Amino acid sequence: MPKLKTHRGLAKRIKISGSGKYLRKKAGKSHLLSGKSRKRKRNLKKTVIVDSTNVKAVKKLLPYL
């Protein structure tokens, strides 16, 4: 069976925590920021854990991470 390829776009966007959970950044923090409140921009900075419904898809795209 051939080797599986890692999805490079996703590999650049996701990190794995020490406990094995997948971490990602929130969307919406790159431009058009003047219309967003200070609180909203502050909350967009945070790193979040990938939702359990998406973990299966992430594992399929990142077979060796």
UniProtKB/Swiss-Prot annotation:
Pfam families found in the cross-reference section: Ribosomal_L35p (PF01632)
Gene Ontology CC annotations of this record: large ribosomal subunit
GO molecular function: structural constituent of ribosome
PROSITE patterns xref list: RIBOSOMAL_L35 (PS00936)
InterPro entries in alphabetical order: Ribosomal_bL35, Ribosomal_bL35-like, Ribosomal_bL35_CS, Ribosomal_bL35_sf
Gene Ontology biological process: translation
Keyword entries, A-Z: Ribonucleoprotein, Ribosomal protein
Coiled coil residues, start to end: none
HAMAP family, A to Z: Ribosomal_bL35
PANTHER family registered for this protein in UniProt: 54S RIBOSOMAL PROTEIN BL35M (PTHR33343), LARGE RIBOSOMAL SUBUNIT PROTEIN BL35M (PTHR33343:SF1)
Family under the similarity heading: Belongs to the bacterial ribosomal protein bL35 family.
Record protein name field: Large ribosomal subunit protein bL35
Species of the source: Caldicellulosiruptor saccharolyticus (strain ATCC 43494 / DSM 8903 / Tp8T 6331)
